[in-house]
Amino acid sequence: MTDTRRAILAGGCFWGMQDLIRRQPGVVSTRVGYTGGTNDHPTYRNHPGHAEAVEIVYDPERTDYRALLEFFFQIHDPTTKDRQGNDIGTSYRSAIFYLDDEQRRVAEDTIADVDASGLWPGKVVTEVTPASEFWEAEPEHQDYLLRYPNGYTCHYPRPDWKLPKRQATA
């Protein structure tokens, strides 16, 4: 492996997101944390405006940003604002924190494909916003579902979920 790339995604409680994303081919490492908020050095008990997020390091020779986003849209409901399952509030919003213009373009294009697909009953409300500082969460939140396999999660892969690309317009 010569180089790696990063992605930062938020889609509800970071425990379930990390557990599923870490298993994807090409994912080298993950860590959970907080981003997109107003305070420095946020904690689980004090992270105003921050989303619970997962920082993903991946091998671009084995996967790409689009594939990660397609899986992201499969494992959480991107049509509910500030909510995933029983978790409610801005901490649990759906967001893509892009690191460069190419990630922004791919994110917007993927969202358009999700909206056009009809796979979700409503319109995607996922935020696409520039990445800011990613603050690593406390150790007890890292790899939580590896340590507590029956712990809480509201994330799961949807069977037979395949995102088609929109038809090009003439």
UniProtKB/Swiss-Prot annotation:
SUPFAM superfamilies: Peptide methionine sulfoxide reductase. Its EC number is 1.8.4.11. The active site is at C13. This is Peptide methionine sulfoxide reductase MsrA. Disulfide bonds: none annotated. Has an important function as a repair enzyme for proteins that have been inactivated by oxidation. Catalyzes the reversible oxidation-reduction of methionine sulfoxide in proteins to methionine. It is an enzyme of class 1 (oxidoreductase). PANTHER family: PEPTIDE METHIONINE SULFOXIDE REDUCTASE, PEPTIDE METHIONINE SULFOXIDE REDUCTASE MSRA 2. It comes from the Bacteria. One of its GO terms (biological process) is protein modification process. GO terms for molecular function: L-methionine:thioredoxin-disulfide S-oxidoreductase activity; peptide-methionine (S)-S-oxide reductase activity. Belongs to the MsrA Met sulfoxide reductase family. Keywords: Oxidoreductase. It catalyses: L-methionyl-[protein] + [thioredoxin]-disulfide + H2O = L-methionyl-(S)-S-oxide-[protein] + [thioredoxin]-dithiol; [thioredoxin]-disulfide + L-methionine + H2O = L-methionine (S)-S-oxide + [thioredoxin]-dithiol. The keyword Oxidoreductase applies. HAMAP family: MsrA. It comes from Nocardia farcinica (strain IFM 10152).
